[in-house]
Curated annotation (Swiss-Prot):
Catalytic function, reaction form: 5-methylsulfanyl-2,3-dioxopentyl phosphate + H2O = 1,2-dihydroxy-5-(methylsulfanyl)pent-1-en-3-one + phosphate
UniProt record similarity statement: Belongs to the HAD-like hydrolase superfamily. MasA/MtnC family.
Function: Bifunctional enzyme that catalyzes the enolization of 2,3-diketo-5-methylthiopentyl-1-phosphate (DK-MTP-1-P) into the intermediate 2-hydroxy-3-keto-5-methylthiopentenyl-1-phosphate (HK-MTPenyl-1-P), which is then dephosphorylated to form the acireductone 1,2-dihydroxy-3-keto-5-methylthiopentene (DHK-MTPene).
Magnesium found in the keyword field: yes
Name this protein carries in UniProt: Enolase-phosphatase E1
Cofactor(s) for this UniProt protein: Mg(2+)
Assembly information from the UniProt record: Monomer.
GO biological process, alphabetically ordered: L-methionine salvage from methylthioadenosine
EC number per UniProt: 3.1.3.77
Keywords, comma-separated and alphabetical: Amino-acid biosynthesis, Hydrolase, Magnesium, Metal-binding, Methionine biosynthesis
Pathway: Amino-acid biosynthesis; L-methionine biosynthesis via salvage pathway; L-methionine from S-methyl-5-thio-alpha-D-ribose 1-phosphate: step 3/6; Amino-acid biosynthesis; L-methionine biosynthesis via salvage pathway; L-methionine from S-methyl-5-thio-alpha-D-ribose 1-phosphate: step 4/6
Gene name for this UniProt entry: mtnC
Amino acid sequence: MIXAIVTDIEGTTSDTXFVXNVLFPY
Protein backbone atom coordinates (compact mmCIF):
# COMPACT_ATOMS: atom_id res chain seq x y z
CA MET A 1 0.00 0.00 0.00
CA ILE A 2 2.83 2.39 0.90
CA UNK A 3 4.53 1.68 -2.41
CA ALA A 4 1.32 2.59 -4.23
CA ILE A 5 1.10 5.88 -2.33
CA VAL A 6 4.73 6.72 -3.03
CA THR A 7 4.26 5.79 -6.69
CA ASP A 8 1.26 8.11 -6.89
CA ILE A 9 3.20 10.98 -5.31
CA GLU A 10 6.46 10.45 -7.20
CA GLY A 11 4.88 9.24 -10.42
CA THR A 12 8.25 7.90 -11.50
CA THR A 13 9.20 4.28 -12.10
CA SER A 14 12.81 4.94 -11.09
CA ASP A 15 11.80 6.30 -7.70
CA THR A 16 9.35 3.43 -7.26
CA UNK A 17 12.10 0.87 -7.87
CA PHE A 18 14.31 2.72 -5.38
CA VAL A 19 11.57 2.87 -2.73
CA UNK A 20 10.68 -0.77 -3.29
CA ASN A 21 14.32 -1.68 -2.89
CA VAL A 22 14.48 0.28 0.37
CA LEU A 23 11.22 -1.11 1.74
CA PHE A 24 11.92 -4.61 0.41
CA PRO A 25 15.70 -5.06 0.13
CA TYR A 26 15.18 -8.81 -0.22
